[in-house]
Amino acid sequence: MGTTAYHLFRLYMDDTFIDMDASIIPMPFEKIMPAVIEKKADFGVIIHEGRFVYPDMGLELKTDLGLWWENKTLLPIPLGCIAIKRDIDSAIACDIQDLIGKSIEHAFLNPFMAYDYIQTHAQELDEDVIQQHIGLYVNDYSKDIGGKGEAAINTFFEKTCASGLIKKSESSLFAC
């Protein structure tokens, strides 16, 4: 239960329903919508491609956690990242960051080279859904998070630490 979606949900619940205690049922993301449909759960946090197809499954939106976060903080959602162990030499860490950046840039310039791989691993195979998913999650922040992205990550960690969801670290969150 260490995902961004889980932490956003908990922050939202703490902010909106201060004394409400929700029972969390951990499960892989592809099982969330079926669990709600089969009434094994009252609601679920829908992520990845599910956010584009939930209406087709008879589900309705109650709260968009991303929109809630963006309105509350005026920052983008800090989704996913590539992490490196803190004991890796900083020069090596920065070289790795540069290589990953070049790989992402190559993918931006050649979007269809990865399409077979994407289709093999996608939960939803509809081409429009795949394109919506890529369009939403693969963006300029993928290449360089910049100051606003760093602020989003720092704010996310500050809020999750303050609410007791994670332990505070004295180390910088950024290697380069």
Positions of predicted regions on the chain:
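Bilobed "Venus flytrap"/periplasmic-binding protein-like clamshell domains
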Residues: 1-43, 49, 151, 155
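Secondary-structure end/capping motifs
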Residues: 88-159
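Short linear sequence elements within intrinsically disordered, low-complexity coil regions
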Residues: 11-14, 142, 161-162
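Pocket-lining segment of extracytoplasmic ligand-binding domains
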Residues: 23-120
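Solvent-exposed, flexible loop/coil residues
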Residues: 66, 73, 145, 149, ...
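Short, surface-exposed acidic
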Residues: 16-24, 124-133, 167-172
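Conserved C-terminal helix/tail region of periplasmic/extracytoplasmic solute-binding proteins
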Residues: 159-176
